[in-house]
Amino acid sequence: MSGHSKWATIKHAKGAADAKRGQLFTKLSREIIFAAKQGGPSPEGNARLRLAIQKAKDNRMPSDNIERAIKKGSGELEGATVIEIILEGYGPGGVAVLVNGMSDNRNRTVSDVRHMFSKSGGSLAESGAVSWIFETKGVIGVETVGLDTDELSLKAIDMGAEDVNIEEDYMEIYTAMPDMEKVRQQLEAQGVTVDSAEINMIPKNTVKLDEETSLQVLKLLDKLEELDDVQTVSSNADFDPEVVEKYHSQA
């Protein structure tokens, strides 16, 4: 899982690629709208909505915005129809890239994503081309400054986590998708501050890249995540930490 871990850590270190607060809230709102439309407006009976609301709260989205998004999803308020779009492609070096989007206009989203792939020397692929490389997991992020990481790792496994990854002052805890909420709640009950908790697509295997290709892929992932209609981006690239630092220094 190291390839995903390093990319997730990159996002943590530089802030989200969509650091513009307004754009971030738009993305969070779309996830809430879609979840409420699919499973109903009650968080108690809608796991996806619970996760979307929690993510919004983690990012300090005002409660009024959250409530308004729920009402749009349930039909209580008028709003554009939001659909989920999964796009697959190949980046520089043949890296597999999976793009999850929420949009009110599929044609616009596909066009924007295709343009970013083309600019990077990559290409969009047919459905199923790379999705088999990934599996859905819960990923919980914890800042580990002042914590005993060995002890925390053992606790997380005892709580039901499948794996952990530690890089510098950050730990990622991987769970089966249905177990993420439970593990998060147990961590917080023991005084652990959870930095993030998301459902992500994790590569089963990763590919090592040379420096030039790594920099190209990192730029592509950033540019994709900056698109208004894109929620998350996953790849099977394994980045060298020194190359990541170089990328940040050039950004």
UniProtKB/Swiss-Prot annotation:
Gene Ontology annotations for the cellular component aspect, listed alphabetically: cytosol
Entry keyword set: Cytoplasm, DNA-binding, Transcription, Transcription regulation
Compartment(s) where it occurs, according to its Swiss-Prot or TrEMBL record: Cytoplasm
MF (Gene Ontology): DNA binding
Principal location listed in the UniProt entry: cytoplasm
InterPro entries: Integrase-like_N, TACO1_YebC-like_2nd/3rd_dom, TACO1_YebC_N, Transcrip_reg_TACO1-like, Transcrip_reg_TACO1-like_dom3, YebC-like
Entry keyword Cytoplasm: yes
GO process annotations (BP): regulation of DNA-templated transcription
Pfam families: TACO1_YebC_N, Transcrip_reg
Superkingdom classification of source: Bacteria
Keyword Transcription: yes
Family under the similarity heading: Belongs to the TACO1 family.
HAMAP family tied to this protein: Transcrip_reg_TACO1 (MF_00693)
Cited PANTHER family: TRANSCRIPTIONAL REGULATORY PROTEIN YEBC-RELATED, TRANSLATIONAL ACTIVATOR OF CYTOCHROME C OXIDASE 1
Protein name per UniProt: Probable transcriptional regulatory protein DET0444
Originating species: Dehalococcoides mccartyi (strain ATCC BAA-2266 / KCTC 15142 / 195)
